[in-house]
């Protein structure tokens, strides 16, 4: 579908006939040749003094040439001014900001390409070949029967005679209507299906069946010798139109007064009638088909057959002018709209021509003729003729015809496709339009549509300037209309003497421009000290200052050109070509000059939340274009109309639309638009949705069909991207609001096995993966799929990334087993925020207690908040900036509880499993100042946020039966910068590394600590207090110092809330692994140290020294407040 929308303007060239050179000359110059400015329109003659007119002509031509030079120079200076203004704006910018602006322009350019394709989309018109195939299949108006192997084939005499010399000779012997001709074919091997395929080929030029015998050259040669080799279908049909052999219908034109005479038997001259074939006109036009079938039902056709006279069709010339009849028939036979075949004599029945003659207007232009013919095509239901007229009108768009075409296409009977092309011309040539007189004839609606476009080719200063001029002109017209009739046309009228600017009423001018000025992007006006802007503000037309003049919370000035530095609602700059080219030029120069800065990572931020409440209210990107109006339980049937006026199409058409939508999504152009417009995926999806709707002939208001198809077809499945509709509880899907704790992102396990096509995401801070990392992902178990919730086509996001978690509810304190990670409290829950009570359960030897503890721990793991999985870096960044000014020396009491290692087989301790597998890539960013150490026995790797592979989309909740990878597997448990809520991968929390202990000693070492009312854990009397002194400015070590006499260790512990954490930030800070990822050791050194650590406890001091050295290496890159911080501070 929509093949005609991709090759404009070349798509219209085959349909438009006539002289191509004359058509090219017509565009933009037609009004002059039609209005008497040609060579033949000589208004006067001079018998004497031929030299004076020649001299005057020379002087005029010389002055005109000089004027053109000045105009050309002024235009070039204007373009140079735009480039100079953009260069001055970017003079003080950083190279990253210029790069961000250029990327914004590239994203807008990709959207413009999709918007252009959508504006060119329209339903595919039926071609001559398709209509002839339907004619052979449905047997409209057949007049002869072919008998072959006792099978009757009704056919059309004129088509077979024009296509095949064999049938021309055969049918000439039986000229009567309905003759039966027995076929005797000498070629061997011709059966009934093959004969039917031969007839189908004569009608369409293609074989209708896939038969291997048609690949045999010998059979084709024998058929060509017997039947002859036909020409192409276009050539033979053109010959049939020219000679009209075996015609069986005539078209007569008359006014209402002549209809009685026509029926009374008064025949017009045959030269005044047009001959045609019933088969062709019934195949191409449903209007003529229904007319001829009605004549057959009423018996009128039998009379014509008895008298052997052609069928006469009388048309009202006031509806279908006679001069267009030849153009209509020519298009029916050839699929080409050729206005050059118009009859020389005008039709007196044409109402528009009568009005033109009365008004004294010149002859109709080519565009006006195409407009009138377009209405006739719609009346005849002849889509090929209608689209050909649309192409002619679109080619005729110029400054002279723009207003007339815009007005005509705006009417209900006008063409929406032509209206989109006229608006596109207005936006592309707006700089030329606003400096001409045509600009003041534009209506407010057309002007409003133009200035709302992101692709308007004009600077904001010129838009504001000429909008005010347009408003002043409209106000002068109002004043002229209000003046008395006695002054109209006199020297005292407003049109003659004019109105001074100071005499205009500002209130009335403001009322005229009130609906237009809000769409002028004042923040993007260049130069910044624009006189046009200051004058408009002095006159009171603009009351609010631009947002870049307003101070932000950081005390500086915002940048309205950049998305991440905008103070308010971001409005992207228009894709003005001089600005775009100059910005790219400046970026190239800066990248050459600042090579060192370019090597740094340029992080693109798009729609990044700037406050914590926006992180809390975050929803999947696909949801903000969906209405989610699900079918209620009391509603018996789905809706039958869309947008209260458009009927819902049939299911087969709906499936074709969804298939076409998926096909467009996988194209390179759409994927590029998705990649360049991160965060604007809904806009990209909407462009391709309205393109599909227009290709299927539906209005743009029916976009909900593709955004939420399950609302209209609840029992159907539309491809891989559309699960079945489920009955959802109220409040289950909430857009831009805080979801209730009980219903937030529940029942999403089904999307684990759901992999829609995705655009390539941006790759900021992506840690390199290892083969072991992928093996661990592949080892995750997949949950059984449950019922799918409603899914939209607005944005192809991956719902498998949102894992199933439920909000914590009131109940007994959870118990953590050594094999389960201690989850931080859910900051998105309103109940018990920051007051999560945690207690260590006393382990018993009974299996019942162990099973109960395992169930409680599994429930706690499932209560991990979805927030930190969605946007971990954003949440941690917010908590970091809110705590960076509150750093005070504190006496941190070590509240960590120690538990013995769970029973395991012989081998190295599990807390040493990550020592030989530390990652050698050491570059990473630290978001927080207070790093808490969290341990667990079973290290677990979370799926990467930017990894959309099948192995990555697995549930992250560990099962109790999962096996911990041994150290020989080389599992990588380094930091995942997009999973900050993980616990540390090792159980190392003291200053020394203990050896293996017996299970009996481990059982004796288990203790239980009660909680105090203030939330801190009580210690036993024999346990010393561990102090962690923080200096000023604090550079806290990541490893707490433990007393050497404390020999009880355990891989699982619970982290309490420290003094610097608040209710809003508790649980958002990342748990930094106790073993740093920074390591520069050789493999030999690491293996040697691993053996030494596993042998005895005497190397604890050496290990502590190595850890402190690694911590000092990574400390320089940890604090965001350092002046030599390598990464640019974000908009947070």
Swiss-Prot record:
PROSITE patterns noted in UniProt: BTB
A cellular component term, taken from the record's GO annotations: nucleus
Can you supply a Gene Ontology BP term from the record?
morphogenesis of a branching epithelium
Q: State where composition is biased (Basic and acidic residues).
A: 928-939, 1000-1019, 1083-1093, 1105-1114
Q: Which Pfam families match?
A: BACK, BTB
Q: What is its main location?
A: nucleus
Lipidation (N-myristoyl glycine) occurs at 2
Question: Which UniProt keywords are listed?
Answer: Developmental protein, Lipoprotein, Myristate, Nucleus, Phosphoprotein, Repeat
Q: Which residues form the BACK domain?
A: 413-479
Respond yes or no to whether keyword Repeat is given for this record.
yes
Domain BTB intervals? 142-211, 247-341
Q: Where is the composition biased (Polar residues)?
A: 1-10
Biased composition of type Basic residues is found at 918-927
Q: Which PANTHER family match?
A: BTB POZ DOMAIN CONTAINING 7, BTB_POZ DOMAIN-CONTAINING PROTEIN 7
Function description = Acts as a mediator of epithelial dynamics and organ branching by promoting cleft progression. Induced following accumulation of fibronectin in forming clefts, leading to local expression of the cell-scattering SNAIL2 and suppression of E-cadherin levels, thereby altering cell morphology and reducing cell-cell adhesion. This stimulates cell separation at the base of forming clefts by local, dynamic intercellular gap formation and promotes cleft progression.
Protein name (Swiss-Prot/TrEMBL): BTB/POZ domain-containing protein 7
Which gene is annotated as encoding this protein in its UniProt record?
BTBD7
